[in-house]
C-alpha cells in the first residue's frame, strides 16, 4: 500500500478515535459510521481498521506508556493529542513494520493538522522520550 494511503488511514483514525473518546460508543459502531459517512477511496481501509481496533483494545496500555512522559495529567490532555499519541504509541509498540522515525514523524504531522497551535511540539516531546524506551534497539 502507498505511503499516502497509510497517511490518510492515520488521519481518518485520528478523527474516528476523537469521536470514540468523546462518545464512548462501541468502536465497531464508530468505525461503521465513519466509513459510511466519509470518502475513503484513497485510504488504506485495512490499516485504518487495524489502528482503530488496536488503539481501542490497548488504550489503557497505551495510556500507561505515555503517562511517565506527560507534563500534565492524562485527563488534562486534549482529545486530539490523546488520539495522536495513542496511534503513535500503538505503532511503536505493536507494529514493528512501521519504522521508528515514521511513527514519530506521522504523529507530528497529525498533530499539526488536527491539534492546537503547538500540540505538535508536545507530541514530539512525549514521543522523543517514550520511543527509545519502547524500541530500545530499533531506531
UniProtKB/Swiss-Prot annotation:
Cystine pairings recorded for this chain: none
Gene Ontology BP terms: DNA-templated transcription termination; transcription antitermination
Gene Ontology MF: a single term: RNA binding
Gene3D superfamilies: NusB-like
InterPro entries: NusB-like_sf, NusB_fam, NusB_RsmB_TIM44
SUPFAM superfamilies documented for this protein: NusB-like (SSF48013)
GO cellular component, one term: cytosol
Highest taxon of the lineage: Bacteria
Keyword line: RNA-binding, Transcription, Transcription antitermination, Transcription regulation
One Pfam family it belongs to: NusB
HAMAP family noted in UniProt: NusB (MF_00073)
Family: Belongs to the NusB family.
Function: Involved in transcription antitermination. Required for transcription of ribosomal RNA (rRNA) genes. Binds specifically to the boxA antiterminator sequence of the ribosomal RNA (rrn) operons.
Protein name from the UniProt record: Transcription antitermination protein NusB
Amino acid at each position: 500500500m502507498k505511503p499516502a494511503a497509510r497517511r490518510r488511514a492515520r488521519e481518518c483514525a485520528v478523527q474516528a478515535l476523537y469521536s470514540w473518546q468523546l462518545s464512548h460508543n462501541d468502536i465497531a459502531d464508530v468505525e461503521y459510521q465513519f466509513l459510511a459517512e466519509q470518502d475513503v477511496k484513497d485510504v488504506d481501509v485495512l490499516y485504518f481498521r487495524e489502528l482503530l481496533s488496536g488503539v481501542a483494545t490497548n488504550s489503557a496500555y497505551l495510556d500507561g506508556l505515555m503517562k511517565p512522559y506527560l507534563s500534565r495529567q492524562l485527563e488534562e490532555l486534549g482529545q486530539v493529542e490523546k488520539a495522536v499519541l495513542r496511534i503513535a504509541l500503538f505503532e511503536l509498540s505493536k507494529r514493528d513494520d512501521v519504522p521508528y522515525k515514521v511513527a514519530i514523524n506521522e504523529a507530528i504531522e497529525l498533530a499539526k493538522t488536527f491539534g492546537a497551535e503547538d500540540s505538535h511540539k508536545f507530541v514530539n516531546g512525549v514521543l522523543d522520550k517514550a520511543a527509545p524506551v519502547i524500541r530500545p534497539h530499533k531506531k
